[in-house]
Design a protein with these regions (language model features):
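Strand-loop-strand
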Residues: 4-223
Length: 223
């Protein structure tokens, strides 16, 4: 088994599926004879993200992951359908081909474009019950990477903070609130439970434009 250290200084990478470039990357990996690799990675994209933990390479094509991820106002996505700057902490555990992600995330700033994201949502006076089983996630992460294709998200809380918007041809609304998230990329199952408060914005209906100064989006999860 390999033994020793590998260091990356001043690296960069572009993630086409996320639409962001990571810069000023630093990485340190320490390889032990028993097949355990201790890693530390830091990357910048507006804010900063760091990864620490261990990777077991007993099975090279399916290493075992035990990682902690921290975001500090990190530009995690910048796509045509969704843009998000995140803070918070996640853990990534389990085999590479079926990892489990859990933790607490905060959306410091974000925008979701409804038509692009293909949401089947009927909003009436900004009071809605959303069936999250109807959300098409196929465009979020287009990749043949087995990690991304099979990732599961459990016991995860998403806190949406001010300066987070949902936008469509009829709607432009700032949101605030908290959701519990359960997502299985492999089966395309998504459950969101919680409420988002509409803080301000506008909504068009029947040929008229209405100003929004309150209301609630309720997410009820899967049936």
């Amino acid at each position: 088994s390999p033994e020793g250290e590998m260091v990356l200084i001043g690296g960069g990478a572009f993630a086409p599926g996320l639409g962001v470039r990571h810069e000023n990357m630093f990485g340190l990996s320490t390889w032990a004879p028993d097949g355990q690799v201790e890693i530390e990675i830091i990357a910048e994209s507006e804010g900063e993200a760091s990864v620490q933990g261990s990777v077991g390479i007993g099975e090279v094509t399916n290493p075992d992951l035990d990682l902690e991820v921290n975001f500090q106002e990190f530009q995690a996505m910048d796509r045509r359908d969704v843009s998000a700057r995140l803070s918070g902490d996640l853990t990534i555990q389990g085999p590479y081909i079926r990892p489990v992600v859990s933790g607490d995330l905060f959306v410091d700033e974000g925008t979701l474009f409804v038509e692009e994201f293909q949401r089947a949502v009927d909003v009436v006076d900004l009071l809605a019950s959303v069936d999250t089983t109807q959300i098409d996630l196929s465009s979020v992460l287009e990749s043949s990477n087995r990690f991304l294709e099979n990732v599961r998200m459990e016991n995860t809380t998403l806190t949406v903070q001010r300066n987070s918007w949902i936008r469509s041809a009829r709607m432009n609304v700032e949101l605030d609130g908290q959701l519990d998230v359960l997502w299985d990329r492999q089966t395309q199952e998504l459950a969101l439970v919680g409420e988002l408060e509409a803080l301000r914005g506008s909504y068009g209906a029947l040929g008229r434009q209405f100003q929004v100064d309150g209301g609630t989006l309720r997410f009820l999860g899967t049936s």
